[in-house]
Amino acid sequence: MQLRITSRKKFTVLLCALGLISIVAIYPRQTVNFFYSTAIQIKDYIHFYGYRPVKSFAIRIPASYTIHGIDVSRWQERIDWQRVAKMRDNGIRLQFAFIKATEGEKLVDPYFSRNWQLSRENGLLRGAYHYFSPSVSASVQARLFLQTVDFSQGDFPAVLDVEERGKLSAKELRKRVSQWLKMVEKRTGKKPIIYSGAVFYHTNLAGYFNEYPWWVAHYYQRRPDNDGMAWRFWQHSDRGQVDGINGPVDFNVFNGTVEELQGFVDGIKETP
């Protein structure tokens, strides 16, 4: 039975080979064009994503960037930061982490203090973010954030996560966002980073706050649709896997050099 199957397979392969040779002989130009086109499509597909498939991280990593990081919140629960910092694959390691601190007027992420301390202790650059609630006073939200986060030299500037406008007009939303940014900048001495999705940015924020660094979320794209935004960070996936973290985690890249990255963490005022 085994010999019969093997012979049948060989015969099938021979027929396919003869058929391919016949096609090439009859339609040489068309065949060459087909294979060339297919090769280009494969190349473009690979280039479309960047493209470095990294098995351990379970995602494709944009290949044009060398500085990689994650962002986390209570949804990742208890993180083993030592394992996160030690993870390496295909020349890629995680160098920074943005950590959720607060939301709205009252919510403090239950894992923030632990994440804030251990990420730094294990050698990652760290940043803290506030999820902006459009229905709550911007000044109240800024005070909550500043009371929660103890900035130290070497930390990223504060981050404001703007993803919804509720019942506000885009103009009113921008006014409240501006209030938060100015309060936090005055206290920390550094312009905060603004995080938003590409679509929300285009609809509500494009053309404003150009003096601030941007962190854009746009998944599974060759590059983010930035609509003229001079972005510094790109959240390119929400499906990454990292040692020491249960479940999926957001992945980000920094758009710049190591020296430029250092500029982000220089000069922030320490806060109690």
UniProtKB/Swiss-Prot annotation:
Which CDD domains does this entry report, sorted A to Z?
GH25_YegX-like (cd06524)
Q: Which residue pairs form cystines in this protein? A: none
Q: Single Gene Ontology BP term? A: carbohydrate catabolic process
By its UniProt entry, which InterPro entries does this protein fall under? Glyco_hydro_25, Glyco_hydro_25_AS, Glyco_hydro_fam25_subgr, Glycoside_hydrolase_SF
Task: Kindly state which keywords UniProt assigns to this record, in alphabetical order.
Answer: Glycosidase, Hydrolase
Pfam families given in the database record? Glyco_hydro_25
- Source organism superkingdom: Bacteria
User: Which residues act catalytically here?
Assistant: D71, E163
What are the GO MF terms of this UniProt record?
A: lysozyme activity
Give the family, as the similarity comment puts it.
Belongs to the glycosyl hydrolase 25 family.
PANTHER family, per the entry: LYSOZYME
- Protein name in UniProt: Uncharacterized protein YegX
Q: What is the lineage of its organism?
A: Bacteria, Pseudomonadati, Pseudomonadota, Gammaproteobacteria, Enterobacterales
The protein's gene is named yegX
